[in-house]
Amino acid sequence: MSKQEKSNVEDKSLDIETAAQVETAQESASGALEELSVEEQLERAKDTIKELEDSCDQFKDEALRAKAEMENIRKRAERDVSNARKFGIEKFSKELLPVIDSIEQALKHEVKLEEAIAMKEGIELTAKMLVDILKKNGVEELDPKGEKFDPNLHEAMAMIPNPEFEDNTIFDVFQKGYMLNGRIVRAAKVVIVKN
């Protein structure tokens, strides 16, 4: 082999070596680009997953709020229906109270004649029937004589001094009060002690 042939072979071998190095460098750069691209894709996928998780959490929260609101509406409706049942006769019972008052006033008078006594007994039975019907429907009588005055249950009509009783004690009842299922229909009209 001549020198020139050796030189050509060496040049070709250098060219092959250089080409191999360039190719390796290109592959390395291309691999880095591919790795960077995969990392970017991974980051984007993570961001998308995070956004979807946030949306899912928001929808869950909205669903829970809607469920709670529906439960509150249901409970409120049940309470309203229950109150309508309990207090539906309130107006009716208020209108009956003057009738009871009139009957009770009539019964306070003493009667001597035998016929009048029989009539009084009939009125007493009528009054008892009326009171029983009201009780059956949840109307309770308030006759607070001797109790402490409570402005939620009683209406003070007059005050009198009486050293035998403590202040704010109910001395007398002008007109009985009535409650319907725990709610005041009419406050008792009373005289209280004020020393």
From Swiss-Prot:
This is Protein GrpE. Belongs to the GrpE family. GO terms for biological process: protein folding. Homodimer. Participates actively in the response to hyperosmotic and heat shock by preventing the aggregation of stress-denatured proteins, in association with DnaK and GrpE. It is the nucleotide exchange factor for DnaK and may function as a thermosensor. Unfolded proteins bind initially to DnaJ; upon interaction with the DnaJ-bound protein, DnaK hydrolyzes its bound ATP, resulting in the formation of a stable complex. GrpE releases ADP from DnaK; ATP binding to DnaK triggers the release of the substrate protein, thus completing the reaction cycle. One of its GO terms (molecular function) is adenyl-nucleotide exchange factor activity. It holds the Pfam family GrpE. Keywords: Chaperone, Cytoplasm, Stress response. The lineage of its organism: Bacteria, Pseudomonadati, Pseudomonadota, Gammaproteobacteria, Thiotrichales. GO terms for cellular component: cytosol. InterPro entries: GrpE (IPR000740), GrpE_coiled_coil (IPR013805), GrpE_head (IPR009012). It is found in: Cytoplasm.
